[in-house]
A protein has these predicted regions:
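Accessible peptide chain termini
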Residues: 1, 165-167
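N-terminal G-site helix/loop of the GST-like fold
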Residues: 1-9
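Short, acidic/turn-prone active-site loops that include or flank metal/cofactor-
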Residues: 9-16, 161
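Anionic-ligand binding patches
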Residues: 20-165
Length: 167
């Protein structure tokens, strides 16, 4: 997007947010990340700079909120659940200054084809889903398992660009 930026390694614990509504959960995580980043900036000359925070989570067909998989078995469980079904991906983006903050949440529905045990195992062992919400990256090899999306593709990648632009 051609925007000069600096990454701040904020220390907000996403697991501290206990919420069953995916929209509210995503917002609370982003607000926590933003507060943490702002606290780190408050002691620097960059205090007045705008801060962008974002978070992506997945709402499974069984109505569970998940982020990044904990291990290979968790990845397998998620992919088995997504196989032949539709799930939702939620991302919240927030831009803040010391005076104000603007926030937007985006939902995208993602449908997967039926995946064989072998396909799931091959994908999990490739480690393509490590560190990715829902245990997959639509922009990589997992894209071949997606039959349709309803909403923002960039939301599923991890940053809903149109939502960000419209803030």
């Amino acid at each position: 997007m051609g925007i000069n930026h600096k990454v701040i390694d904020q220390k907000f614990d996403e697991d501290s947010v206990i919420e069953t509504d995916p929209v509210l959960c995503s917002k609370l995580i982003v607000e926590g990340k933003n507060k943490s980043a702002r606290a780190l900036l408050s002691t620097t000359k960059d205090e007045s700079y705008p801060v962008l925070t974002a978070d992506t989570l997945v709402f499974t067909p069984s109505r569970k909120i998940v982020g990044k998989p904990e291990n290979y078995e968790h990845s397998r469980e998620l992919l088995r659940e997504f196989s032949g079904t539709t799930h939702s991906v939620f991302s919240t983006v927030m831009i803040s200054t010391t005076e104000q903050s603007l926030l937007k949440t985006c939902e995208t529905k993602v449908s997967f084809k039926n995946m064989s045990k072998e396909e799931i195992e091959e994908y999990v062992l490739s480690e393509e889903g490590v560190g990715k919400a829902g245990a997959y990256g639509i922009h990589g090899p997992a894209g071949k398992y997606v039959t349709s999306i309803e909403g923002s593709y960039t939301n599923v990648v991890g940053l809903p660009v149109l939502s960000l632009i419209h803030i």
